[in-house]
Amino acid sequence: MGIKVYKPTTNGRRNMTSLDFAEITTSTPEKSLLVSLKSKAGRNNNGRITVRHQGGGHKRHYRLIDFKRNKDGVEAVVKTIEYDPNRTANIALVHYTDGVKAYIIAPKGLEVGQRIVSGPDADIKVGNALPLANIPVGTVVHNIELKPGKGGELVRAAGASAQVLGQEGKYVLVRLQSGEVRMILGTCRATIGTVGNEQQSLVNIGKAGRSRWKGVRPTVRGSVMNPNDHPHGGGEGKAPVGRKAPSTPWGKPALGLKTRNKKAKSDKLIVRRRNEK
């Protein structure tokens, strides 16, 4: 999928880019796989803002994605490649030979008419899903499970990929995009290939309005707020923070504080941290 560049006919168009959607084959989703989505605008059941900078935007339907890929031995044909407003990756509509329809994350190189299959005996081919123990060393994968049968949780964003490095007993070593090397059970499934639509990260929004269409509201700096709204607020003119370190709106340390639980049980499964050389 290529990048479309606009002429600077207005200030908002200057430097604006978008995807050309050349890979998209239809604009009409499969109705049986749609679920309504209610806009929460970042509020909880009490009406209080729990997630800032959310609200407005275009209405969306949620597409039911098959992250489990557990129909072993049943072949499926790719019917369409579609846009999904709920994620950066594109999705593919597949029709199984037993009549079931499903959406999957569209990997790079997947084409309409291509046949895919899941199961331990599946070929090492883009779009096929297998247990990690059955995938050769060096293979690039995505949509990786953390618990067998739960469905893919890792490596699902556009352009993301991970690589199988080896096997240690019942675990398989996988290098994630961040550089982290992690042990994952060999019975967990993964899909062959890299997630498609990798150029979406190169898009220049161009104007604030495009963010509002996506439901993203403005981010206001704490230093321009009043002191009752933010610890950085108040003062005359461009005043400094006035604290030893920058703070969140709720007075917690910001910028650099580690938030991971020091007693996380999954620590023993991380062979190499993402920030280690």
Curated annotation (Swiss-Prot):
Q: Which domain of life is it from?
A: Bacteria
Q: Which Pfam families match?
A: Ribosomal_L2, Ribosomal_L2_C
The protein's UniProt keywords, in alphabetical order, are: Ribonucleoprotein, Ribosomal protein, RNA-binding, rRNA-binding
Instruction: Quote the Gene3D superfamilies the UniProt record gives.
Output: 2.30.30.30, Nucleic acid-binding proteins, Ribosomal protein L2, domain 3
Q: Where is this region: Disordered?
A: 218-277
**What GO MF terms are annotated?**
rRNA binding; structural constituent of ribosome; transferase activity
Cellular component per GO?
Answer: large ribosomal subunit
Comp. bias (Basic and acidic residues): 264-277
Q: Name one GO biological process term.
A: cytoplasmic translation
Q: Which HAMAP family match?
A: Ribosomal_uL2_B (MF_01320_B)
Q: Which family does it belong to?
A: Belongs to the universal ribosomal protein uL2 family.
Q: What does this protein do?
A: One of the primary rRNA binding proteins. Required for association of the 30S and 50S subunits to form the 70S ribosome, for tRNA binding and peptide bond formation. It has been suggested to have peptidyltransferase activity; this is somewhat controversial. Makes several contacts with the 16S rRNA in the 70S ribosome.
Subunit relationships: Part of the 50S ribosomal subunit. Forms a bridge to the 30S subunit in the 70S ribosome.
Q: What is this protein called?
A: Large ribosomal subunit protein uL2
* Organism of origin: Streptococcus pyogenes serotype M4 (strain MGAS10750)
